[in-house]
């Protein structure tokens, strides 16, 4: 009875106790009290972070939120009623003279603004833009200017609670390429999409790792609500609107410079990671069973992982949907870490221990390599090493289900053919691509000989091209992307004086549609200051257009070359000559002569 009485007493007392009321801060005025009249409208060229000027605003909108707490256990204790005042601002900010091509990041009070959930839009500032519909609804059509010629941004109901119930200081990343078509932005027609690695770098949907409230975005680094791939394409097309074609680079990992021992596999950054709404998978290989890339001395992965297959499909489809032509570019990153104990093929009898760390894929070759004691070059052993690198995959070694491609061949086959044919199937599953490369920059491989004049890798690439054609069909252009030092021929450095146009059988193959060259030919030999050869010839600067144009079909690789590193340091130049009267044979830059003249081997 006493317990019941106590509860009743508490209820009576609490019902008689006054309710405690707490109110948060409230603004005395809901108006923006300052503006700028007569401010200069800036001009922007390129990309710039800049502030702006408010050109229109409504009064702040006030929202009241009341919560009640208290009563205590059994109804005891007084109540606490809390009232908060929330404020929202709708306004427009003029940025610069238009037209601009895009807005990138936005900062509020110096911090990146998370635009997820915020209603905002931008106007380019051209002479055809129409009035903003939100401003029109507030002001009426007759009273709403279109602000033609001025780029501006409109925010609707921006929450102000994080900024002390005031408008934050806003700044914007603005893109405005030069109107002059004779600029990099105006002239660029094709680009390469890298980094080639990154497990979800090419995904067009947001990918998050972890579970519950601890999720972290994998591919929302540029903007908080837009995948990086989409941001990259938006900015590309805004900055370089004439771009028509994109090469999509996707990497697997090689682990040895010896062709006969090298495995080429898809890799991951960590072997255990949960991601949503999609998991990593390449060629049917799961994360747990994939090759794990090397890590540095701070336990960070040296490379990003191979892009997941679904991300590659998404990238191809989104680029095609934007009207871009897609070239697929398979890439090999060499994961040979420092301190390795692998036999070095670039040593006599391959007896030296330790290969160069993280080398260029173009150094994959036979072992021992040509030019070293014990070399297997020009022997049947070299051919068998090349065959081991390519592997035995066929177009039938894969299972295709929708947009998923899995391996059904021999489990230990990690050859080049498996990689390339996998991506041929994947590109077909994505709806096709405009061009497909069967290999890129492999001079150490393509110059391997099985006899004095037989190049087994060249024949292997021809067979691979035919298999890729059977998957992708006649609508896809197929080629090999030769290194700039590789495309024109092979001149063995053995004192023989031999000259072979070793890639000609590949270039002439009916399944090859064009000559592909990764062109990094030297365009200048300018040194610091003016005490050097090119300045002595009267050229005023490295940026001089005539100087650079003169080195397209001239200068290093055309008129002369450096015979050694010592000669390069001292600018001791050796003229390119040919006793047979055809110096173009040795000119890496002489594309015109290489294309125009008959090719004759000089064994």
Where are these regions (language model features)?
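Substrate-binding cleft and catalytic face of glycoside hydrolase catalytic domains
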Residues: 189-210, 244-453, 477-485
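Stable alpha-helical elements in mature extracytoplasmic
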Residues: 4, 225-232, 308-315, 382, ...
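Polar, S/T/G-rich
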Residues: 3-189, 194-200, 211, 215-218
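Internal, charge-rich low-complexity segments
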Residues: 50-71, 124, 198-209, 257-279, ...
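Short linear interaction motifs
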Residues: 81-99, 174, 213-241, 295-312, ...
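Noncatalytic carbohydrate-binding groove/subsite architecture in carbohydrate-active enzymes
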Residues: 181, 385-603
